[in-house]
């Protein structure tokens, strides 16, 4: 089969966008749904703030460590088979966790959930690079948007379902439905993938960029953004409720955060285009994040929605940029997978400290000012990293030249 035939048998842009969006909807509710019902779970299992933070930190750790295993699984079972299997595992984990009666069972099923999210999520970058390198920022924006829409639905719906049914278990378990739709969608999308492409993709072995300083900078930037994002998703609603800072219900503040985060995801993907230098957008997003978190740390009683919105715009943009930066540095799907896996591994190990550190500081200090001050300091670090994230101009130019192949898909 010629290269031309291999290229023409990729999914169409529209079909791929829809399939990717539906898949991504399933990958965050299992984590985000914990935030609105965290106090209920703490009371049901008599957990401390530090222990409760593990419900968010465990998936982050999985997304870090298991990112390393994803390429091996994809080589053995194919990218599509691995993604579908991960969604099955995720759905089972969500259902089982909602039925657990012990702390150990709660944490174990959270670990299962983390495996499903980790393996599926770490393969998306290479999939985009394989079929849509000429539109990588746009497709990464669609993926990020789907993650955020799923998070928004979980943030808004979990509390409402819990109140309506009188049980946090319904609010935690209902999101397995999105795993079913994700599986069906990806099965349809997989039919448009050419088997020779997957076999070609798995032949080569590309090492992770352990010795590349740029890879470490990108991973650190991504890790800081996820440190902040998961800390906010885990603790925003609970902290606002206990601080009595706003007439707006804490659940709606969390929903506003995730909704604005979603808009920033998509908007950043749309405007990033094929620019060879993303540092201007990185600087803007980091500055907005610093402004928002500093407001929550020091003047929370004055219009917290404004500071929540500023933080959401900054972190929403940072996620799309952080996931796109590894693709900017690479020539091939194999390299893209290696850089993405490395970024996720380092990044999510850093991210796992966010919810845990926030909860631990809350236990130690008895308040939320110190935890939000920690988040502000991490946001400042993101801003300081901006000048160091120089573009790989030569690599990008070669990618743009390759993108001139006509799109016949």
Question: What is each residue range found by the language model?
Answer:
Residues 330-368, 375:
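A late C-terminal transmembrane helix in Major Facilitator Superfamily
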Residues 35, 213-255, 262-265:
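Extracytoplasmic gate region of multi-pass secondary transporters
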Residues 278-325:
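C-terminal transmembrane helical hairpin of 12-TM major facilitator-type secondary transporters
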Residues 134-135, 142-190:
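Helix-loop-helix hairpin linking two adjacent transmembrane segments in secondary transporters
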Residues 65-104:
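Conserved MFS/SLC helix-loop-helix module at the cytosolic interface between two early adjacent transmembrane helices
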């Amino acid at each position: 089969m010629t290269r031309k035939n291999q290229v023409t048998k990729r999914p169409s842009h529209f079909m791929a966008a829809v399939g990717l969006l539906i898949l991504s909807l399933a990958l965050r509710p299992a984590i985000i749904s914990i935030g609105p019902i965290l106090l209920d779970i703490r009371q049901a299992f008599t957990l401390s703030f530090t222990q409760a933070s593990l419900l968010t930190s465990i998936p982050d750790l999985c997304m870090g460590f298991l990112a390393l295993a994803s390429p091996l699984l994809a080589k053995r079972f194919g990218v599509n088979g691995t993604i579908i299997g991960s969604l099955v595992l995720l759905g089972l984990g969500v259902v089982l966790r909602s039925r657990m009666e012990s702390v150990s069972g709660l944490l174990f099923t959270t670990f299962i959930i983390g495996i499903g999210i980790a393996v599926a999520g770490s393969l998306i970058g290479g999939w985009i690079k394989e079929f849509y390198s000429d539109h990588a920022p746009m497709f990464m924006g669609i993926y990020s948007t789907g993650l955020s829409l799923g998070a928004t639905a979980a943030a808004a719906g979990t509390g409402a379902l819990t109140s309506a049914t009188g049980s946090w278990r319904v609010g935690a378990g209902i999101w397995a439905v999105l795993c079913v739709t994700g599986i069906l969608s990806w099965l349809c999308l997989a039919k448009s993938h050419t088997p020779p492409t997957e076999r070609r993709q798995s032949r080569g072995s590309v090492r992770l960029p352990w010795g590349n300083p740029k890879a470490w900078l990108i991973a650190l930037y991504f890790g800081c953004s996820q440190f902040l994002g998961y800390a906010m998703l885990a603790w925003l609603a609970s902290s606002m409720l206990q601080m009595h800072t706003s007439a707006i219900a804490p659940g709606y503040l969390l929903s506003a955060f995730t909704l604005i985060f979603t808009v920033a995801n998509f908007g950043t993907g749309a405007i990033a285009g094929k620019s060879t230098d993303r540092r201007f957008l990185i600087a803007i997003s980091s500055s907005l994040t610093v402004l928002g978190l500093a407001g929550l740390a020091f003047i929370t009683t004055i219009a917290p929605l404004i500071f929540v919105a500023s933080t959401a715009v900054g972190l929403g943009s940072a996620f799309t940029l952080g996931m796109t930066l590894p693709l900017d540095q690479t020539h091939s799907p194999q390299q893209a997978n290696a850089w993405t896996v490395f970024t996720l591994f380092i990044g999510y190990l850093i991210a796992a400290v966010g919810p845990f550190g926030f909860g631990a500081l809350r236990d130690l200090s008895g308040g939320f000012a110190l935890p939000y001050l920690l988040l502000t300091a991490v946001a400042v670090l993101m801003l300081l990293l901006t000048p160091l994230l120089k573009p790989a101009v030569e690599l990008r130019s070669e990618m743009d030249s390759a993108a001139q192949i006509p799109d016949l898909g």
